[in-house]
Amino acid sequence: MTFDDLLPRVSPAEAAELASLASGPVLLPGDEGYDAECLIYNLNVPLEPALVVGAADAADVQAAVRFAARQGRPVSVKTTGHQQVRPARGGVLISTRRMKGIAVDAGRRRARVEAGVIWQEVMDQAAKVGLAPMSGSAPLVGVAGYTLGGGLSPVFGRSQGYAADHVRSLEVVTADGELRHVTPDNDPELFWCLLGGKGNFGVVTALEFDLFPVTSFYGGGIYFPGERLAEVLHTWRIWQADMPEEMSSSVAVQRLPPLPALPEPLRGAFVVHVRFAYLGSSVEGERLIAPVRAAAPALIDTVEETPCTAVGALHMDPPTPMPYYDRTTLLRAFPAEAADKLIELLGPGSDSPLASVELRMLGGALDREPEVPNAVSSRGLPFVLFGFGVGTSERGEFLSAELEAVMNAMEPWADRRRMVNFLSTEEATDSERLKEVYGAERYRRLTAAKKAYDPTNMFRVNHNISPG
């Protein structure tokens, strides 16, 4: 039990007072619409706030933050709920999904989007003028949370860096209830903290970022039988080392559910899913991926010229909420010994219960500091490993142990830093572990800024950086 669990309920009169100041709905537990606003992607971490504000604009966010400040309550933020690591008990949940403004400036190759926008909406708008954003693997993820956590694009990452590296300005409501327009020039420290520090410093209501003059890429996925994991993984491991920055790739060991929506060869199958995205000609792309394509007979091969609006087809991330447990680590190297460990733990003789364990190439521009620095902590590391298992709390201990076994096996090659957007609930709520996630120097700087911008730790329903 935490201090927030002991906070009193918000009374109907208090909620009504806030509702008189807001244009969006204000909801208490039991109200119609409350449960829908609290729904998130990981059903094992239910949100249970004392009050929900369905913000329609930045003024609603300000009203919610000021209300929380008067009552000494924490504030949490949700657009789609892809990374909610605490239940928000006793707090004010600001739901931004109604804030849907999108403005694409084709001449400047930029977009300004409000906090409730998801990536598919930006992709569709940008494509109309021949541009594309640095969206992630899941097109239904919210732009703001993804970008504030760094933002790893499976298409543009290795050639352009993190999504956070291309942010030009942010509009954010800080703990004092003020709406600030933040740029590298007018508040360089807050700008640095927001991009990588995620939701610890305020509620971002809008952001402006670069777009790229790209309409398609050569990419897709090849599904191999899981029984050929050894050949495919070792081939991919050797192959990726010589790839140009324009090529991005990942490999996932997956045990797929028997869903009718899946093609018959994949239904309930044990597979190795290799994904590719090449920013170049299809002829050159086909030549580059040929060694992996030849590693084993494929079940399905979807690699082709692909519009940027269809980036979700690369990873085929689950589109609906489910109960799951996950873990992640960053690797300094992935030698043959590391590949053999994964084959032992995940291969055809393992009976692994994990739904997916994937390894993504990093490197290239992801290693380089951007022109305007930010707090993204994962530069200089060539791989990120991420795994998840599907199951409710009854299987939680079992699935967590299986995930830990995989991550522990990678320990000889692992770094102590992590990608913030990939943190599990267990990792994100371990205050000592968070210091390692960012590294000592970066964490000290974030802590100092937290004391300045959020001294009471209002924004703590997250991977919390405490003001001390």
Model-found features: residue ranges?
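Soluble FAD-dependent oxygen oxidases
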Residues: M1-G468
